[in-house]
Amino acid sequence: MMTKSNTKKSDKDLWATPWWVFHYAEQYFNIKFDLDTCAMEHNTKVKNFITPEQNTLTADWQGRYCWMNPPYSNPLPFVLRAISQSVLHNKTVVMLLNVDGSTKWFDMCVRNAKEIVYITNSRIPFINNETGEETDQNNKPQMLVLFEPKAPYGSLKSSYVSLHEMKEKGMLQ
């Protein structure tokens, strides 16, 4: 049974990442991100960022360690872009995505990522674009996907972290 979203269409792709999720990813992967590839001025996690108007699918990525929380309505082109930036341009990319094993983009992650960290026991309370507050309206589980240059094909590592542990560790930053 599919869970229907109650999010207004105008906000569907605009929810921001809580800081503690971003900090956890930096800590877990031992990365200091220098580019936020899908952001707006009011919600970027890094000084260097790409806006929707600049279009991360075509823009030059001026960073080596890239954070990406893409629009969830159509993640496939963003997954493909992250893979190509990693393979062709020597970028390390961490994506925050829904867990949906029935999709082509999920299969692309499994085939190309170095590691996938599944977030368990709850769902990320993303930041509502209108209110700036964490929301409990997220209807799908999430995962962190790490793409690294020269990661050997078929070397995927799967890891798990509870949302509670992620928040606890991420808030220490």
UniProtKB/Swiss-Prot annotation:
One biological-process term from Gene Ontology?
Answer: symbiont-mediated suppression of host innate immune response
Record's keyword terms, sorted:
Host-virus interaction, Inhibition of host innate immune response by virus, Methyltransferase, Restriction-modification system evasion by virus, S-adenosyl-L-methionine, Transferase, Viral immunoevasion
Q: Which PROSITE patterns match?
A: N6_MTASE (PS00092)
* UniProt-listed Enzyme Commission number(s): 2.1.1.72
Q: Which reaction does it catalyse?
A: a 2'-deoxyadenosine in DNA + S-adenosyl-L-methionine = an N(6)-methyl-2'-deoxyadenosine in DNA + S-adenosyl-L-homocysteine + H(+)
The answer to keyword Methyltransferase applying to this record is yes
What residue intervals traverse the membrane?
none
Q: Which domain of life is it from?
A: Viruses
Question: GO MF annotations for this entry?
Answer: DNA binding; site-specific DNA-methyltransferase (adenine-specific) activity
The record ties this protein, via InterPro entries, to: Dam_MeTrfase (IPR008593)
Q: Which Pfam families does the UniProt entry name for this protein?
A: Dam
Which function does this protein serve?
Methyltransferase that methylates adenine residues in the ssDNA and dsDNA sequence 5'-GATC-3'. May prevent degradation of viral DNA by the host restriction-modification antiviral defense system.
The record's annotation in NCBIfam families points to: phage_N6A_met
Q: Per the similarity annotation, which family is this?
A: Belongs to the N(4)/N(6)-methyltransferase family.
Protein's UniProt name: DNA N-6-adenine-methyltransferase
